[in-house]
Swiss-Prot record:
Protein name: Palmitoyltransferase ZDHHC16A
Entry keyword annotation includes Transmembrane helix: yes
Phenotypic effect of disruption: Morpholino knockdown of the protein causes malformation in telencephalon. Impaired neural stem/progenitor cells (NSPCs) proliferation in the telencephalon.
Enzyme class: transferase
């Protein structure tokens, strides 16, 4: 055997003997207390059911807390932004576009634009106000006979089906979809219809402004571009892409040309009012086009959820449940879906054909189906089928 290996083997035996000797010197009673303390410490955090999702949520808990605090404190700021931006578009439409419509459009088109624009504006204002002021619905805190599926770990109260806890509102919400910072309110059972209708009619209104004002936008953009060229020539900057971007000191030849242009153009071709008109048209078109794309995508997503009879939260829950059952060879079926058309009827509260007009296309403050605690709507409302 190699001498180094023999020395190493002897050293390991000595260390093992020392450890055994030290352990034997520790009283058994002390070792028992140490084991008990270790057990108590592990009981505070150890859970055999803990998975990667729980660990991820625990790590991101400070981020969630910060988002909740910011959303809670800036809720009124978001509401103010919605009101301010919408009011600015309405102001431009009334003082810039409406006079143009009255002087250039035929009587038929003029009546159509005025009627549609005001109808759309009324629907937007009504549904936004109702979505903001209507409580989403809360589970009863007193003991009742209503069946519940679980107990909220935050509120410590029975939680009915489709109810979830909102960390921003600090309470449980009936049929919670999400907390909307633009409403400064949760979207739940009693204001879900108002929220979706607001998104739908605001999207339609922005699309209407964007499409009907596209020619005005092109004219205004070209006019502003011409004004930039004229101002650049006056200052002696070459009328090129680089010259418009970089305000350099003009050369002698360019300076002479600038003096000549300044002498020829003694009066500005457009007044301040004309400039503000063109800038307002550009602002309105860019804003409404952007909102049309962003809010339109959100509206389509919520329309898909309504068709499936689920909320944004239930979409994730149902997806996980479907994957779990798929591994067992089973198909998951949403118990709260009554069919594509019936889901829309339940959502809008449509009971007869005339309700599509009075409850969907006109402002209506009717209550939704049910109380948000139980969901046996379809067996009790079979007369909805022929609508």
């Amino acid at each position: 055997m190699h001498p180094c290996s023999s020395v190493l083997h002897l050293l390991l035996r000595c260390m093992r003997g020392c450890c055994r000797h030290t352990r034997s010197r520790v009283p058994r009673r002390l070792r028992r207390h140490v084991s008990y303390i270790r057990l108590i410490f592990k009981s505070l955090y150890f859970n055999s059911l803990t998975n990667s999702d729980v660990v991820t949520d625990s790590i991101l808990e400070p981020v969630f807390w910060m988002v909740e605090v910011v959303t809670r404190w800036f809720g009124m700021v978001f509401v103010f932004l919605v009101v301010a931006l919408t009011s600015s578009v309405v102001f431009i439409a009334y003082f810039c576009l409406l006079p143009l419509v009255l002087h250039t459009y035929s009587p038929g088109w003029m009546i159509w634009h005025i009627c549609y624009g005001h109808w759309n504006l009324v629907m937007i204002v009504f549904h936004y106000y109702k979505a903001t002021k209507t409580p989403p619905g809360y589970p009863p805190k007193m003991k009742t006979d209503v069946p519940f599926v679980s107990v909220c770990k935050k509120c410590i109260i029975p939680k009915p089906a489709r109810s979830h806890h909102c960390g921003i509102c600090k309470t449980c919400i009936l049929k919670m979809d999400h907390h909307c910072p633009w409403l400064n309110n949760c979207v739940g059972h009693f204001n879900h219809r108002y929220f979706f209708s607001f998104c739908l009619f605001l999207t339609l209104g922005c699309m209407y402004c964007s499409v009907s004002g596209r020619h005005l936008f092109i004219d205004a953009y070209n006019t502003i571009d011409q004004l930039k060229h004229l101002e650049a020539e006056k200052q002696g900057v070459p009328v090129t892409g680089i010259g418009l971007l970089i305000g350099i000191v003009p050369s002698a030849g360019v300076a002479g040309k600038a003096v000549q242009v300044a002498q020829e153009v003694s009066q500005p071709p457009y007044t301040y009012k004309d400039r503000m008109f063109h800038k307002s048209v550009i602002y309105m078109w860019v804003l409404t086009s952007t909102v049309s794309v962003a809010l339109g995508a959100l509206t389509l997503w919520h329309a898909l959820l309504i068709t499936r009879g689920e909320t944004s939260i239930e979409r994730h829950i149902n997806g996980k449940e479907a994957k779990r059952l798929a591994k067992r060879g089973r198909v998951y079926r949403n118990p709260f879906s009554y069919g594509k058309l019936n889901n829309w009827k339940v959502f809008f509260g449509v009971e007869k054909r005339s309700h599509w007009l009075t409850r969907v296309l006109l402002p209506s403050g009717h209550a939704p189906y049910g109380d948000g605690l139980t969901w046996d709507i379809y067996p009790l409302k079979k007369d909805m089928m022929p609508v």
